[in-house]
Amino acid sequence: MKHQGVAMVISAIFALLTAFPAIASAGKILRYTDHEPYGNMRTQFIKNVFFSEIEKESQGRLKIGAHWKGDISSSYNALSTLGQGTRADIGIIVPEYTAEQLLLHQIFKSFPLGPANGEAQVRFFHRVFQQYPQFARELGQNNLVNLQFFLGYPVGFFTRQPDVKLKQLEGTKWRTASFWHQSFLRNAGGATLVMPWNDKITDALRTGQLNGLMVNLDSGDDIHAQRAAPYIHYSPALWLGHVYLLVINKDTLNALDERDRLAIRRAAETTEKQLGAALDSGLASLTTRLENEGAKLHLLSRDEQLEWQKATRYQEVQEEWVRQQESKGNTDAGKLMHELRLLLEANARQKR
C-alpha cells in the first residue's frame, strides 16, 4: 500500500508538470480588429513586427487573435466597438471616420505638406503625441488608450490627362473624401463630386465624369484608378496626415499585469524604430509596381509642392474650421492648430 501511495503521488506530480507548459502557453489572447484585409504594407507590418514583439516581450503570456477585413467591426464602428470592449480588445481606428468624437485628431490632415520621408513623419507624430496630452485625453474620453500609431502612403493625384497643373484646376471635376481636401481642390479651381468609395469611381474616371481622384496612393491602386487615370502626381511630402491608431480598451489595459503592460510598451518602442524605413520601402515598392503596370508617375518638385500648397489657401480653411470649433466651446482647437503649424514649419526649414 505504501509503494502504491508513493506511485500515486509521483503520477500526480508528473501529470501536473506535463500540464504546466500547456497552461502557461495558453496566455491571454487579445482580440484584434482591423477594417482592412491582411496583406498590405500596414497590416503585414503590424502582424509581423508589433504582434510578434508583443508575444516575444511578454514571453508568450500575451497573444493576438487577429481579425481582418472588418470581421468584427467596420472602420466607422471601430471606435465604439473598441470602447465597449466586449467584442474586441485592441484594434485600428481611423480618426477621420469619427470626426465628432476625435475632433482634435482632424487637425493633421489640414496640412497639404508635411515631413518628406518616413523617418521624419514618425519623429513628428512621436513628438506630437508625447508633447500634447490633449490627443490621449480625447481617446480616454472614449475609453481607449493608444498603444502605437501607424501611417499610410502619401497623396496621389490620379488624372486622365498628362501635365495637369495642380495650382490651376479650373474646369475639372474631382473626387476626394476628406473635407479638408475638398476645400483645397475647390480653392485651386476644381469642383468636387461626392461618390461612395468603390470601383465605380474608376468607371467615372474612364467616362470623363471625373477628371481626377485625390487619394492616398494605395487606395487608388485598390480600385485600379491608374487604369483609367494613369497620370499620377505624387511626393512623400504630399502628406495625407492619415494616421492609424492601434488602441486598446482602457479597462482591458488596466486589467493586465504590470509586466504585460511594460511588455507592450517595449514592443511599441521596437516597432516605432522600424516604422519609418518600412514606410519608405513600401512607397518605393508601390511606385515601382505602378510604373511597371503602365502608370506615368510624376514626382513633384519642391517648387511644385509649394505652388499646390499656396493654391489650397489651407490656412484660410484652417482658420474657418477653428472658428467653428471655438463657437462650440472647443478651445483647444486653435492652440493645437497653431502649435502643429509651427512644428511643421520648423521641419520644413530644416530640410532647406
Predicted features by range, described:
Residues 1-5, 9:
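Positively charged n-region of N-terminal signal peptides that target proteins for export
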Residues 4, 22-23:
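Hydrophobic, aromatic-enriched, well-ordered structural segments
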Residues 9-21:
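Bacterial N-terminal signal peptides
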Residues 129-130:
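Intrinsically disordered, low-complexity, polar/charged regulatory segments
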